């Protein structure tokens, strides 16, 4: 009976393992990868919380201080003990002059704008990083595919040579050379697989998925159209990294206004009630009750010139950095457009004049070897050249794609995904 139970348990375990289905791979295009990153990336979520923090600070600014309740009581028990006493109750409130509370709210609202722009810029940078990581993975895969295609041809050649060697038509040395080249290619492909896995790992971190999730890249490495839009004022106003300097200037102006208003401290208004009982020998006991109003105005002797000078310097700093950022954006657009166009031209020339020709030469040497007009060394020399040209073509194609994407983000033409 015990043996039957053990066998049954083993069978159930086997069936459970056999019934497990591997989760389908996550299919990703460049666009879906960006959308996933904007939803899942934890660093981006941390930046977004800065907006809530700024809103919290703004909600606390521009408020009156709490009113103050006062109560006083005194008597002459420890002295003459004639029954004299006094009572005083009051409520006071401080009121700012010159709209200081409104200016505090202005500063708080500007801080919210700055936090929002920081989040938008983080989204822009993350989107660019994701697209570059996606392209990097595609490039690694294209390199591996190029080697795999030549590996298949090399393995077929090795089989042909082995069959010919058995008929004493070629030497065993040539067979070993072909097998050695196949093994070398297999090792390179294994290294490519490691590089591809590392590229996918970086992509997974950016899009915020588990390292255990399988990813299937839905696109292949291809030439990306070059944006034709030109630099304009709208480009600047669409770039959050430039807008932040504009808002920084606005923030300095708001803080200067707040400092000027703060030179006049709050006016304090108090409503009070007093009651007292005193004893005078000729008159006897007398009672008094008073309801009054008082206010106090601090004199504006305190100077905020140092703080104002600081904000004036920060305003000039923001203006200078805004101009520098504008020049940087213009230079980036010019450079990325130049590189994208140049790489597109190089790619076209490379495909027609180099890659296709090297493939034809390799094919001709292969035919010549089969017809005993060329040796194996000539074939593998042409093979090495053709492989190198294919890998160079992959590198050029990847650079064209990267610069086209960089130009798109420099022009602020990225998809306006929901943040």
What are these regions (language model features)?
Residues 89-93, 203, 293-299:
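Residues on the lipid-exposed face of transmembrane beta-strands in outer-membrane beta-barrel proteins
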Residues 28, 122-238, 336-343, 385-386, ...:
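Periplasmic alpha-helical coiled-coil/stalk elements that build and connect Gram-negative outer-membrane
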Residues 165-169, 368-375, 410:
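A short glycine-centered flexible hinge/capping loop motif at secondary-structure junctions
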Residues 1-4:
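Positively charged n-region of N-terminal signal peptides that target proteins for export
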Residues 20-23, 392-419:
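Acidic, low-complexity, intrinsically disordered peripheral segments
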Residues 9-17:
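Hydrophobic h-region of N-terminal signal peptides that target proteins for export
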Residues 45, 64-84, 94-121, 243, ...:
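Small/polar (Gly/Ser/Thr/Ala-rich) solvent-exposed segments
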Residues 18-73, 94-95, 103, 169-172, ...:
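Bacterial Sec-pathway N-terminal export signals of envelope proteins
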């Amino acid at each position: 009976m015990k043996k039957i139970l053990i066998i049954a348990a083993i069978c159930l375990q086997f069936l459970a393992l056999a019934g497990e289905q591997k989760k389908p791979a996550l299919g990703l295009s460049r666009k879906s990868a960006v959308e996933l990153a904007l939803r899942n990336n934890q660093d981006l979520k941390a930046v977004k919380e800065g907006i809530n923090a700024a809103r919290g600070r703004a909600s606390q600014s521009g408020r009156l201080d709490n009113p103050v309740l006062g109560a006083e009581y005194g008597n002459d028990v420890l002295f003459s003990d004639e029954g004299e006493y006094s009572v005083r109750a009051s409520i006071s409130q401080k009121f700012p002059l010159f709209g200081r509370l409104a200016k505090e709210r202005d500063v708080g609202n500007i801080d919210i704008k700055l936090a929002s722009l920081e989040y938008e810029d983080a989204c822009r940078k993350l989107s660019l990083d994701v697209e570059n990581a996606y392209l990097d993975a595609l490039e690694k895969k294209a390199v591996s595919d190029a080697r795999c295609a030549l590996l298949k041809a090399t393995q077929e050649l090795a089989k042909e040579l082995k069959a010919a060697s058995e008929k004493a038509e070629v030497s065993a040395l040539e067979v070993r050379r072909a097998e050695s080249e196949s093994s070398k290619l297999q090792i390179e492909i294994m290294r490519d697989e490691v590089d591809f896995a590392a590229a996918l790992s970086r992509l997974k971190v950016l899009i915020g998925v588990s390292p255990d999730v399988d990813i299937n890249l839905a696109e292949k490495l291809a030439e990306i159209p070059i944006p034709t839009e030109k630099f304009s004022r709208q480009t600047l106003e669409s770039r959050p990294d430039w807008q932040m300097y504009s808002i920084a200037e606005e923030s300095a102006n708001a803080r200067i206004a707040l400092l000027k208003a703060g030179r006049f401290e709050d006016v304090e208004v108090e409503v009070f009630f007093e009651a007292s009982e005193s004893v005078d020998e000729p008159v006897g006991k007398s009672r008094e009750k008073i309801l009054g109003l008082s206010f106090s105005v601090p004199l504006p002797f305190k100077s905020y010139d140092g703080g104002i000078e600081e904000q004036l310097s920060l305003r000039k700093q923001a203006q200078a950095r805004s101009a520098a950022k504008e020049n940087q954006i213009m230079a980036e657009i010019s450079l990325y457009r130049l590189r994208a166009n140049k790489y597109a031209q190089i790619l076209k020339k490379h495909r027609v004049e180099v890659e296709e020709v090297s493939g034809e030469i390799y094919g001709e040497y292969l035919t010549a070897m089969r017809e005993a007009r060329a040796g194996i060394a000539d074939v593998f020399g042409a093979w090495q050249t053709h492989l190198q040209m294919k890998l160079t073509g992959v590198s050029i194609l990847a650079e064209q794609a990267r610069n086209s994407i960089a130009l798109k983000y420099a022009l602020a033409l990225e998809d306006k995904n929901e943040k």
